[in-house]
A protein has these predicted regions:
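An acidic/histidine-cluster motif and surrounding catalytic segment
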Residues: 1-71, 75-215
Length: 215
């Protein structure tokens, strides 16, 4: 598989504050081979994001990557990030035939802890930091979005091989505005989402450990 993690960071050129933020997140992390990709402009932010991701995946196919990391410019590493553990989990999820490996989510419907630090998820939101594997490239490229669709919800419709690291290694930094999801513009809203999902996964992890110890 890849030696360094091929990383594509999405940034609207006018959002210089986000560009500076995301460069600071990655500049001292040598395990990532990152490039900043200019986001496709569209009057509907979610459509522009999807089109940008399509362009990235087409590029990844041309470069014959086994997987890539797609990252939005509001991604922020948490203190839980560990280079060797992240790389190990990328390989572990690949052995499970994962389509996506998420660094952190703002919502999920169902979850099952398969191993310490790795959950299978059903229905999620949060594409600020995710590994997408080669097996899913063409499937992603065949996605079509309507004006009222959202890319993460659309992915949920076509994949049941979505996994997430826990504890989260990625959350979304609040900038006071969103180019994709207007409901996330309220102060503290995004932080609350991630706090809630973290607590839910912590409970599921605790219960799994508890019942295993009863055996």
């Amino acid at each position: 598989m890849n030696t360094k993690i091929p990383t594509f960071i999405i940034n609207l050129e006018k959002r210089y504050d986000r560009r500076i933020h995301i460069q600071n997140e990655f500049e001292k992390r040598n395990e990532f081979d990152f490039r900043i990709v200019s986001a496709t402009q569209h009057n509907i932010g979610a459509i522009g994001l999807w089109k940008t991701m399509r362009n990235i995946i087409e590029q990844a196919k041309m470069e014959n990557y086994d997987y890539i990391l797609i990252c939005e410019d509001d991604h922020q590493f948490t203190d839980n990030y560990n280079e060797s553990l992240f790389i190990k989990t990328i390989h572990d999820a690949n052995k499970l035939q994962a389509d996506l490996l998420l660094g952190g989510v703002s919502y999920f419907e169902d979850a099952v802890e398969l191993d310490k630090g790795l959950f299978w998820l059903n229905k999620f939101t949060g594409t600020q930091f995710f590994i997408i594997y080669k097996r899913f490239f063409d499937i992603f490229l065949n996605i079509t979005l309507n004006d009222d669709d959202n890319i993460d919800l659309k992915i949920n419709e076509i994949s049941d091989q979505i996994y997430c690291l826990y504890p989260f290694i990625s959350i979304q930094k609040e900038f006071g505005y969103s180019d994709v999801t207007q409901k996330n513009e309220g102060s503290g809203t995004v932080n609350d989402y991630f706090h809630t999902t973290t607590k839910r996964l912590a409970t599921l992890s605790y219960l799994k450990t508890y019942f295993e110890e009863l055996k």
